[in-house]
Amino acid sequence: LRDSLITRARNKLVAEFLKQKEYTHLFFIDADIVFEPQQFIRVLLYEQPLTCASYPIKHESPIEKGDASFGWCMNFPLGKYDLADNDKGFKTVNYAGTGFMCIERKVFEQILKKYPTIKYKTDVRANIDNEREAVAVLGNEEYAFFDCGIQGQGVLEDKENTQRYLSEDYFFCALWKQCDGEIWCDLTSTLKHIGIKEYT
């Protein structure tokens, strides 16, 4: 899939996924994530609707230069960042990056049921080379599961009045949490994130 906007690309993939009624899980794996097969299996088979694994932010520690990252693409509940919630090594987190995330069909269905206004129609050719195919996709229905937004505006709630700006992956996590969902992160599968170097 070629698209200049990551938000639109993710939404397009979800729309195609939802058209295939026999599909049960959508697993996002970004091209810059390095993982082992067993890490994929752990996240896929964990019995929760939304699961993921942690990977480092592409940012060096200002104290120790090297391959070690300064942070992780996830956000823990305040004061609960040290231990997994169970002996399988998974923990609930506030938000997580979508670069290595497994999502059951019912997650999208529940969000769409609560927020039907996120539906929109495509207005781009989606980089399709064939003119006839390009015209055919114009006006297709897609859904803004992945968008950027400010908490307290649009469909985003803001109970703590933070007015925080959310990236597209945190936006999606916020929608799912507003449906009483949880984000379960595998803390034992430490992935690598490729940038100007391989961050660990």
Predicted regions and their residues:
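Short, Asp-centered acidic motifs that coordinate Mg2+ and/or phosphate
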Residues: 25, 49-50, 183
